[in-house]
Every structure is written in structure tokens, then in C-alpha cells.
């Protein structure tokens, strides 16, 4: 298994698909990384030589991925909560942040129903 950005990417998959196992790398970014590294999209990871894997590592290293990205996202949410703005309050209360209705839906964000005690 090739190790890129601290993640073991699967050997049996195509390079583009395998790169999406890294948090912060989606389909579009994986294609641009492969193009910049000069690697065809249909090549499997097990068929890459060490120089090509190193080229992928350098291209992935140009982006914010994995732990740094997770930390950045959580710090952004924490900043909103500390500011006390509307979005921060919604995060703090565990409710939808982007204006969705909450009277009937929003079960994913609110969690399972709590029975009313009589």
C-alpha cells in the first residue's frame, strides 16, 4: 500500500479513486493532482513506481488535507460559536445552520425523537 498524507491508499483501485480516500481530496481535486503529477487516471496504484508515488505526495502536499483540514473546519465552527452569531448559536444548539425548517424535519441534526414525559 502506498502511503500519502499519512493515509494508506488502496492498491487495487485506480489512482484517481484511491486518492479520494484522503480527507479533503474529492473527484475533481484527485483528477487535477493526477494531471499535475503526469499520471494517467486509469493506472492502478500497485502499478505506480516510487517516483510517481513521490510526485503524488508532493502534489497532495500543496493542499490542506487530513488532520490540518479537520482542525481548520473545527476551529471555524468554534470561532462562530465564540462570536455568538446566529450560525454559532445554531451549531451550539445542534440545529440546522443553513435555514432549513425544524418543525417537522431536521432529525439528522437534532438526533432521535425524545418522548414527552407526562
From Swiss-Prot:
Recorded GO molecular functions are: rRNA binding; structural constituent of ribosome; tRNA binding
Q: Name one GO cellular component term.
A: small ribosomal subunit
InterPro entries reported in the protein's UniProt record: Rbsml_uS13_C, Ribosomal_uS13, Ribosomal_uS13-like_H2TH, Ribosomal_uS13_bac-type, Ribosomal_uS13_CS
Disordered as annotated region, ranges: 94-118
Q: Does the keyword NAD apply?
A: no
Question: Where are its TM segments located?
Answer: none
Question: Does this UniProt record's set of keywords contain rRNA-binding?
Answer: yes
Which GO terms of type biological process are on file?
translation
Which of UniProt's keywords are assigned here?
Ribonucleoprotein, Ribosomal protein, RNA-binding, rRNA-binding, tRNA-binding
Q: Which family does it belong to?
A: Belongs to the universal ribosomal protein uS13 family.
Quaternary organization: Part of the 30S ribosomal subunit. Forms a loose heterodimer with protein S19. Forms two bridges to the 50S subunit in the 70S ribosome.
Protein name in UniProt: Small ribosomal subunit protein uS13
Tell me the organism.
Tolumonas auensis (strain DSM 9187 / NBRC 110442 / TA 4)
